[in-house]
Amino acid sequence: MINEFPEEYDNLDIDISIKHVVEGALASKLSGYFLIQNNKFSFSAVAFGRIGGHNINVKISKTTGDKIRKLNLDPEIVILIVQRKIIEGDITIQTKKQ
């Protein structure tokens, strides 16, 4: 697969954790966080998949975007990477302890 992200993002380590999922008939709502350089960033998302395959729409707050910019990263590119990782299953799903 061709990487469409700028070269400086090739070695960016992003760990994604899903904390909460609400499943629906057509879409699921997710919330969680991702870690970049020991910085924790919260997000919400809507995941769906029908004709055309799976898709996800990740949202972050303006404040979160500003914090990502302070790391000299483009929040739009970070969101695209997070979305791709979620679709590819490169995530941790947190479960409630019994």
Give the residues covered by each predicted segment:
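Negatively charged, low-complexity tracts enriched in Asp/Glu with abundant Ser/Thr
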Residues: 1-33
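Acidic, low-complexity intrinsically disordered segments
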Residues: 2-8, 13, 42-98
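Short, cysteine-centered beta-strand-loop-beta hairpins and adjacent loop/turn segments enriched
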Residues: 26, 35-46
